[in-house]
Amino acid sequence: MKPLRASVFAQAILAFYFQVIQWLPLGNWNYQPGFPPLGIQAIHGHATAQDVLLMTAFVAPFVVFWFAYSKGLRWLMWIGTCGYAVWLALEVKTWWVAYAFGATDSWLRIYQRVFSRSTQLLPSLGRHLPPDGMHLVLQVLLTSVVVLAVVGLLKTSVRVDST
């Protein structure tokens, strides 16, 4: 599969995964005290239009990239890729810096309050707190989206420039 096509596929999986973890209760996979999934909030009449709009907005990058891919709009694909790269950078800053160098007191309190009962796939070593499983999968998907898009866009750039 060509990298750009693979990136579109990875983006579809990412968009689907993000919706699933936001809407459905998946036990400890997406358990966060005080933040019930939107599906539960909707059943109890607590989901707002703003909540639904925000979740819909997370599908927009995939739709825009897919449109740009189908029309050959490389500049728009680059903008989309930059957006995904910023999201990935925020994930790295939030999770991996604390895992590699140790959590600040503030992050330690947040982690214990919100993520201590989440599914863990990586070991926790003292103050070196890993991303929970839900975020780890999200980060793997984001990384694949960004890498595949950049490789695909650079490869198509070489082909366009050499013709």
Whereabouts are the PLM-identified features?
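Hydrophobic transmembrane helix segments
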Residues: L14-L54
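Alpha-helical transmembrane segments of integral membrane proteins
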Residues: K2-F9, V52, R74-T81, G133-V140
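Juxtamembrane helix-break-helix junctions at the cytosolic face
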Residues: V59-W78
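Cytosolic juxtamembrane helix and N-cap/initiation of the first transmembrane helix
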Residues: M1-Y17, G133, V145-T163
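Hydrophobic alpha-helical membrane-insertion segments
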Residues: A10-Q19, W78-G102
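Juxtamembrane non-transmembrane "cap" segments at the membrane-aqueous interface
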Residues: W95-T119
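Hydrophobic alpha-helical transmembrane segments
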Residues: M1-L4, W23-W29, T48-F58, L76-E91, S118-V147
